[in-house]
């Protein structure tokens, strides 16, 4: 018959006996603090106490712990854990508990403390990263919204035209995701409208009998749509997208006139580029009128905004593409189309880095550039971009590794040096003050650290715990033993190591030790 609560009841009784001082057979001293406890409990929970009591059980009533490593509050917490099975850190630093548990060889507590320190560091790093991301997102959204409203107000508009007569050029993000094949749209070149490729009519084209809306009104409607799209994609702006964008299949096989939409830098306005192929059926319809509208849109949008909102690192690309475009317009006929490479450079040069995931997938892979989303620098390959991004992350990790100003870090008041916990600070302060709190009761000699006092105490007890393996001579200090071995047994040790390496037998070392010791006694 088992009693499941027996162990809990036993611990409770032992804890009450400890608080009452009943049957406590040892005293643990940590600095000036004294703790009464039971040897059996201490030896069961700590390997340090187990080894301490193993050899001389009757002569170890008082146990001195190194107060430079184990603090009194930390040992009190560990003593409560031994008797109650509960670990409550309260306001005690985790570093002090970790140092005390390591000193007492309480490995379960060491694991818990290391885990808590790791979680604490991860939490601080995540909170710092969220604050930086939130501030960067808000700054980008404000700058984009201000730029969009400013340019939209400067563009000419036709207020007399109705909303139903304006060309809705850009499809929504939902339409782009649902119908990737309709990413390129046709623009009607006459008042009656032209049937679209594949037998589908354009949903936003004007009906028969109505005139096409002017480029100014079309551009105005596009600017209004761009402002709302930037506000909707504020969260997407913070995402780090390093994937290589691929072009849509079938762009090269378009057999009808088309245009491509492009967001102008930061303002997210659309610059309409219209080209027509050399088709005999469509080459004679409204050519002169349409070319005039096309040139008006191009001059009003590109020349006014290209210089004002162009980043410094994209200026060479932009100027180069503009020169090539002007030469192409002077030499090319009406039936020529823009090459995919120049179109990609133009679109990516005028595109905000956060909008590249939405637009660059419709461009050809030739002549790709890779932009850093943090500093907007351009790189020729994704591998170089990854190397560049690692420098940003190293800088951020270095900033996060610095302790915050509001955190209570143990700091020396004299030299300003910081420490991980209080016991190392107290140990360091003795180097400034010259304090020697540990005094020998036999001769009155003082020491700065407790381990020096323990080593000195052996002189008065005349114990010789350090024995030589070769001649059985014993010494008080370990240093005396090492000097003795170097002086008398150095050649013997070297010869033994050479023999053991040459023979490589598992028992050759023990055999040689016995033989040599017999030779020494002759």
From Swiss-Prot:
Region Disordered, residue ranges: 121-164, 190-221
Covalent link (Glycyl lysine isopeptide (Lys-Gly) (interchain with G-Cter in SUMO2)) residue numbers: 273
InterPro entries reported in the protein's UniProt record: BTB/POZ_dom, SKP1/BTB/POZ_sf, Znf_C2H2_sf, Znf_C2H2_type
Zinc finger extent (C2H2-type): 370-392, 410-432, 438-460, 466-489
Positions of region (Interaction with DNMT3A): 310-427
PANTHER family documented for this protein: ZINC FINGER AND BTB DOMAIN-CONTAINING PROTEIN 18, ZINC FINGER PROTEIN
Protein name: Zinc finger and BTB domain-containing protein 18
């Amino acid at each position: 018959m088992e009693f499941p609560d027996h162990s809990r009841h036993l611990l409770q009784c032992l804890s009450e006996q400890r608080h009452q001082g009943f049957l406590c057979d040892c005293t643990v001293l940590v600095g000036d603090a004294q703790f009464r406890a039971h040897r059996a409990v201490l030896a069961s929970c700590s390997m340090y106490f187990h080894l301490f009591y193993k050899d001389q059980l009757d002569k170890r009533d008082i146990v001195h712990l190194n107060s430079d490593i184990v603090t009194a509050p930390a040992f009190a917490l560990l003593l409560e854990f031994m008797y109650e099975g509960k670990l409550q850190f309260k306001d005690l630093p985790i570093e002090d508990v970790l140092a005390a548990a390591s000193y007492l060889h309480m490995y379960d507590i060491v694991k818990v403390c290391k885990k808590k320190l790791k979680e604490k560091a991860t939490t601080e790093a995540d909170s710092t990263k969220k604050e930086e991301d939130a501030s960067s997102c808000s700054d980008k959204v404000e700058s984009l919204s201000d730029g969009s409203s400013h340019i939209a107000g400067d563009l000419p508009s036709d207020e007399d035209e109705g909303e139903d007569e304006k060309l809705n050029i850009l499809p929504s993000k939902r339409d782009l995701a649902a119908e990737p094949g309709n990413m390129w749209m046709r623009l009607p070149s006459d008042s009656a409208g032209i049937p679209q490729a594949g037998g589908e009519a354009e949903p936003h084209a004007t009906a028969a009998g109505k005139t096409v809306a002017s480029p100014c009104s079309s551009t105005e409607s596009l600017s209004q749509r761009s402002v709302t799209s930037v506000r909707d994609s504020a969260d997407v702006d913070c995402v780090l997208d390093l994937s290589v964008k691929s072009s849509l299949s079938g762009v090269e096989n378009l057999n009808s006139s088309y245009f491509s939409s492009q967001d102008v830098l930061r303002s997210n306005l659309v610059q309409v580029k219209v080209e027509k192929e050399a088709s005999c059926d469509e080459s004679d319809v409204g050519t002169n009128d349409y070319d005039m509208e096309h040139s008006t849109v191009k001059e009003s949008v590109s020349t006014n905004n290209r210089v004002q909102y162009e980043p410094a690192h994209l200026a060479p690309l932009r100027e180069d593409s503009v020169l090539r475009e002007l030469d192409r317009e002077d030499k090319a006929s009406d039936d020529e189309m823009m090459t995919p490479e120049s179109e990609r450079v133009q679109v990516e040069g005028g595109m905000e880095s956060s909008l590249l995931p939405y637009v660059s997938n419709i461009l050809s892979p030739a002549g790709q550039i890779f932009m850093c989303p943090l500093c907007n620098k351009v790189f020729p390959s994704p591998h170089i971009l990854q190397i560049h991004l690692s420098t940003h992350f190293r800088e951020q990790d270095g900033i996060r590794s610095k302790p915050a100003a509001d955190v209570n870090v143990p700091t020396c008041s004299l030299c300003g040096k910081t420490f991980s916990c209080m016991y190392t600070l107290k140990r360091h302060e003795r180097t400034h003050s010259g304090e020697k709190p540990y005094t020998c009761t036999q001769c009155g000699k003082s020491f700065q650290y407790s381990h020096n006092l323990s080593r000195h105490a052996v002189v008065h007890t005349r114990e010789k715990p350090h024995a030589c393996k070769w001649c059985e001579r014993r010494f008080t200090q370990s240093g005396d033993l090492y000097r003795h071995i170097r002086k008398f047994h150095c050649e013997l040790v070297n010869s033994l190591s050479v023999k053991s390496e040459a023979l490589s037998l598992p028992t050759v070392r023990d055999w040689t030790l016995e033989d040599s010791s017999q030779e020494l006694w002759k």
